Each structure stands twice: as C-alpha cells, then as structure tokens.
C-alpha cells in the first residue's frame, strides 16, 4: 500500500488508476480480444472558445511504450484551437492496436493530457500578459505534492521562465527559482533577513528581497535602497486585506526608487495573480511576476477518447466523427483542417501549403525517434505563441 494517497508508477502501468468499467469490458470480451483491432482518437469536448497548448504527451508515450500499438499525435508545445476551420473536432492523439492491449489506459491517457494542457495553456496566457518581463511558476503548494513535477514542467513549456519546485526544476533541467519567505523576516526581523538573503544569494542568481512582512511597502523599498548598493528585485506579496489599489502602490514604490536614483532595483509582485492582473501590474511598473494558483490549478481541458475505427471499418458513437483522421495546418496562415487519414497535404485556400501535424511516435510500441527535451518543447511553444498574441 502506498504511504500517500497517490497511485504509484506500477499502479498506473497495471491499469489500476483506471475506471473499473474498462477492466470489466476487457474481461467480458475475453477470447474475442484477438479479433478486435481499433483506432481511438482523443479530441476536446470543452472549452471550445480558447486555444490550447497541447502538453502531457510525454507521459502517454511512457505508458504505452512496449505495447503492440501505433501512436500518432500532435507534438507537445503545439498551440491550436480544438476545432478546425470547418468546426470539426481536432484529434490530438490517435492510438491503433488491439483494444484489449490498451483500452484499460484510457483514464490515465486522458488524465495526462487534460491537466497538463490546462496548466500549460494558462501559463501561455500569462506569458502573453507579461510581455518581455520574466514570470515564475510558484503554484505547486496549492496542489498535491506528487504531481508537482508535472505542474512545473507544464508551466515551463507554457512559458514560465522558471519554477520553484526542486523536483520540477530537475525534470526540466533548470535551477529552481526562489525569493525569500515571510518566515525569515518573522524569525529574524526584516533587516537581518534581508542581509542574510543577500549574503546567501549565489553568483548567477538574482537577489530578491521581500518587503511586505511588517512595513509599508514604500518605506521598506526606500530603506532597502539606502541600506544596500546591489539588489536586483524587491518583492511585493501584499495580502489582499492590505492591498487596496495595487497598481497605485506599485507606481508609488517605482517613483520613490527612481527619485533616489535606484531605478536599478526592479519590482517583483506575487499573490493571486493571473493573466488579467499581470497585464495591469506590468503597465503600472511591475517588472517580474510570481504566479501560483491560477496556473497550478488551471481548469483542465475536457479531452475524450473514442473508437473511430474497428477492424479497418469506420465506426463510432453518435456525436462523433468516424474514421482515422489527419490534422493539416497551413504553413502560411495557420488554417487548420481535419481530413481523412489518407490525405497528407493539400493547398490552403490562401494558396499556402497545408502539412500534416500528426507525428508517429510509437510503431508497435517502439519509439520512432528520440523525444525532445522540455527546453526544446518550450522553444516550440514560444514560437507557436507568437501567432496567438492578438487572438484571445
């Protein structure tokens, strides 16, 4: 039995983290398993009014690797709407093989991509709001610690410049990012806490001093400017009961620092931020952001997985589109069209070339290529995001 209330890797691999009706269905099929080869596709049921930064595929591949299945998917870090130009559902993943070999993993597959994609998409929206200013993912404390690496990885792919989690940072091959906690000021007092923080800031790290524990933020900022010659950031994590007009407070602090010739000290803000508040605070003068709950607890996308073909024949349930499909995207205008799987490319209505986004990642359970590292996936994501700057 696991110590914490989580499924182990082995539990997931055994299909124990699945809805029981999949297990019962496979048991009921029995000897007919060998004769039932299917193609299943994962599409989004909602929300449909926003684009999605597709994330979580890495874990799907780890789960299905070694099984006799073929898997096609849109690459992680690809950003697109869940419906094509004609209103058809976009298949993000297609798995082909014997149903009894992989059907019990439907729950896990959906869980991997629903939550990770929700987090990375929210991070991408914060990325757009922050502009060129850095923002960091500080939200793992709001979710179960067992999934903290997944949260940090997804936030990083979505656009976070760094993450606070030790395991999450290791997963993305980055150094974890942190400032100083209120606890340090409470235990030692502000001045001693600030000195200790600066003394322990390593070369290459940015020094960040928290200024809202006991003092008025303006006077704390002035005090720091007078006490220290080199400080990279002051951080305002002002609680909502004291915050008032946060934009006005930031402008006030910014003014006082500039008046004293300390425009070199930048302002970082945190506490209850999302893409809407980040945009307003950036316009007010904030230059870095710590974003937590809105990213780590982002609403998951409602992916669903459905059989679309049985033994080579198009078959599916009511409300779904039967048959294996490809997803074509125009290299010029980014128009998306869902087409039958035998169509690999076509000319777009704009005259550009439409190419298939689906990539074959597993062939009979074996990897077809080396999987990209998180940094490479993030790079793809940031290039994709350029197209969505003016699209809500």
Curated annotation (Swiss-Prot):
Subunit-level organization: Homodimer. Forms a trimer of dimers in the crystal.
Q: Which residues bind Zn(2+) 2?
A: 330, 348, 350
User: Which EC number(s) does the record attach to this protein?
Assistant: 6.3.4.21
Q: What class of enzyme is it?
A: ligase
Chain residues that bind 5-phospho-alpha-D-ribose 1-diphosphate: 240, 272, 293
The record's catalysed reaction(s) read: nicotinate + 5-phospho-alpha-D-ribose 1-diphosphate + ATP + H2O = nicotinate beta-D-ribonucleotide + ADP + phosphate + diphosphate
Pfam families membership: QRPTase_C (PF01729), QRPTase_N (PF02749)
Record-linked CDD domains:
NAPRTase_B (cd01571)
The record's listing under Gene3D superfamilies reads: Aldolase class I (3.20.20.70), Quinolinate phosphoribosyl transferase, N-terminal domain (3.90.1170.20)
Instruction: Give the binding site residues for Zn(2+) 1.
Output: 330, 333, 350
Q: What is this protein called?
A: Putative nicotinate phosphoribosyltransferase
Q: In which pathway does it act?
A: Cofactor biosynthesis; NAD(+) biosynthesis; nicotinate D-ribonucleotide from nicotinate: step 1/1
The Swiss-Prot or TrEMBL note on domains reads: Consists of three domains, an N-terminal domain, a central functional domain, and a unique C-terminal domain containing a zinc knuckle-like motif containing 4 cysteines.
Q: Which UniProt keywords apply?
A: Ligase, Metal-binding, Nucleotide-binding, Phosphoprotein, Pyridine nucleotide biosynthesis, Transferase, Zinc
* Binding locations of nicotinate: 21, 138, 179, 235
Q: How is it modified after translation?
A: Transiently phosphorylated on a His residue during the reaction cycle. Phosphorylation strongly increases the affinity for substrates and increases the rate of nicotinate D-ribonucleotide production. Dephosphorylation regenerates the low-affinity form of the enzyme, leading to product release.
The entry sums up its family as follows: Belongs to the NAPRTase family. Highly divergent.
Superkingdom to which the source organism belongs: Archaea
Q: Name one GO biological process term.
A: NAD biosynthetic process
Molecular function (Gene Ontology), one example: nucleotide binding
* Sites bearing Phosphohistidine, chain numbering: 182
This chain's function reads:
Catalyzes the synthesis of beta-nicotinate D-ribonucleotide from nicotinate and 5-phospho-D-ribose 1-phosphate at the expense of ATP.
């Amino acid at each position: 039995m696991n110590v914490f209330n989580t499924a182990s890797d082995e539990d997931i691999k055994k299909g124990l983290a699945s809805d029981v009706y999949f297990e019962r269905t496979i048991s009921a099929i029995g000897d007919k398993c060998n004769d039932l080869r299917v193609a299943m596709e994962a599409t989004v049921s909602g929300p449909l009014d926003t684009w999605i930064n597709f994330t979580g595929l890495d874990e799907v591949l780890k789960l299905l690797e070694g099984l006799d299945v073929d898997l096609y998917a849109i690459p992680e870090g690809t950003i697109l709407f869940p419906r094509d130009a004609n209103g058809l559902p976009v298949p993000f993943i297609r798995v082909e093989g014997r149903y009894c070999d992989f059907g019990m993993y439907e729950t896990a597959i959906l869980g991997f991509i629903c939550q990770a994609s929700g987090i990375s998409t929210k991070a991408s929206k914060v990325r757009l709001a922050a502009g060129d200013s850095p923002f960091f993912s500080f939200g793992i404390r709001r979710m179960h610690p067992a999934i903290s690496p997944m949260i940090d990885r997804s936030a990083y792919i979505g656009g976070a410049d760094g993450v606070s989690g030790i395991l999450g940072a290791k997963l993305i091959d980055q150094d974890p990012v942190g400032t100083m906690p209120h606890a340090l000021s409470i235990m030692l007092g502000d001045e001693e806490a600030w000195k200790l923080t600066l003394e322990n800031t390593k070369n290459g790290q940015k020094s960040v001093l928290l200024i809202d524990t006991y003092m008025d933020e303006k006077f704390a900022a002035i005090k720091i400017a007078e006490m220290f010659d080199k400080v990279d950031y002051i951080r305002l994590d002002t609680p909502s009961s004291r915050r008032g007009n946060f934009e006005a407070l930031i402008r006030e602090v910014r003014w006082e620092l500039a008046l004293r010739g300390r425009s070199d000290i930048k302002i970082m803000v945190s506490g209850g931020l999302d893409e809407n508040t980040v945009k307003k605070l950036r316009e007010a003068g904030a230059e870095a952001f710590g974003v937590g709950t809105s990213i780590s607890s982002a609403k998951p996308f409602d992916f669903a997985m459905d059989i679309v073909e049985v033994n080579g024949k198009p078959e599916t349930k009511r409300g779904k589109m039967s048959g294996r499909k490809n997803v074509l995207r125009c290299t010029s205008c980014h128009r998306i069209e869902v087409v039958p799987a035998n169509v690999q490319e076509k000319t777009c209505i704009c005259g550009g070339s439409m190419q298939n986004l689906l990539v074959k990642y597993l062939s009979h359970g074996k990897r077809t290529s080396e999987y990209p590292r998180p940094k490479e996936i993030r790079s793809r994501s940031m290039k994709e995001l350029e197209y969505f700057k003016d699209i809500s």
